[in-house]
Amino acid sequence: MSRRRISCKDLGHADCQGWLYKKKEKGTFLSNKWKKFWVVLKGSSLYWYGNQLAEKADGFVNLPDFTVERASECKKKNAFKINHPQIKTFYFAAENLQEMNMWLNKLGFAVTHKESTTKDEECYSESEQEDPETAVEAPPPPSASATSSPVAARRASSSSPKRRETSCSFSSLENTVKAPSRFSSSGSKERQSWLDIVNSSPATEDVGHPLSFAVQVHTLASSEASSCRVSENSSTTPESGCLNSLSSDDTSSLNNSQDHLTVPDRASGSRMTDRDEIKSSEDDEMEKLYKSLEQASLSPLGDRRPSTKKELRKSFVKRCKNPSINEKLHKIRTLNSTLKCKEHDLAMINQLLDDPKLTARKYREWKVMNTLLIQDIYQQQVPQDPEVTPQEIMNPTSSDCVENSL
């Protein structure tokens, strides 16, 4: 029976439990990458549920095979990871620092607490569809020619070491084989058991036909099931971390008809990787669009977005290793800014003087509105005429002459 098929109530008294955020494996750019789960630590096993009344766990990890440490690479605060270098890494995050330290202490004790586990026990198990928004059904592996009987499969598994190499190499131990099972009584959904497959290189027979393994799924007696497991264990290399296994719950609920699963060859594996790359490129289109809009200073609707202070500072301050050149560049920028201000003031004066309907009243109104400009003009004349007092600057005689002429 699968370790995940246990309700939250059936676990009984837990060593530690609470709400934690778990990082999704397939999170889109705009959606939330973390989902909240009710996590329960029982002995050396860690379960997480969608809620406290769930009848089945969404995931399970056998902690003695993993290591627990803080996840400094995550941007989310109070994050930690449950890591295995050859299998998988799970990321969790707590609400605050106190809860994170509590979980690290409990999980660290559970990791060091070794339990007697069988070889065919699952290291971890997790539901494929974590979120309906981000769940994408993986294409089934292409089927090849299957063997006609279990005896042929055992012969293929017990062949010579030169001819016993598998015909497919997988990039990681996370790849799974999805068995399309037909339940006899309830007819419920298909389940997926996690199978850890060892990286290997393809090999061909002397005749020229590729050698492939066929896993036959059918109902067996207890003695036959144990013999099949022994044959499967003998076919794997000593370097494999976790052995391939099917839960007894799956095998007992299948019909007598035999469903053959064959490991795809290198060509089919490359096709699957190409499809995954295409899907990842399609998922990144929104991210590329957002970055291009951000570089062009545009909003998602196409409107012009005002530049931020950081962008203005970057565009203005461009440092050079030579300090003298930096001073000259800064002086040039200040002179350009002063020139633009003076051109603006000159344009305002020309607009006033070019007005054919200019009257004394309009000039007084313009003078009140542009008091700073007039003060700046007369302050520049002070060094040339040192006898002028500040009162004369505020009440210049030339402005009276202009008004009289008007």
Swiss-Prot record:
Subcellular location: Cytoplasm; Cell membrane
Entry's Gene Ontology molecular function annotations: protein domain specific binding
Compositionally biased tracts (Acidic residues): 123-134
Keyword Membrane tagged: yes
Encoding gene per record: Ipcef1
Record protein name field: Interactor protein for cytohesin exchange factors 1
Known function: Enhances the promotion of guanine-nucleotide exchange by PSCD2 on ARF6 in a concentration-dependent manner.
Source species: Rattus norvegicus (Rat)
Region of interest: Necessary for interaction with PSCD2 and to translocate to the plasma membrane: 285-406
Entry-linked SUPFAM superfamilies: PH domain-like
Nucleotide-binding found in the keyword field: no
Pfam families: PH
Bias (Basic and acidic residues) ranges: 272-285
Domain PH per the UniProt entry, residue ranges: 13-112
Annotated InterPro entries: CNKSR, PH-like_dom_sf, PH_domain
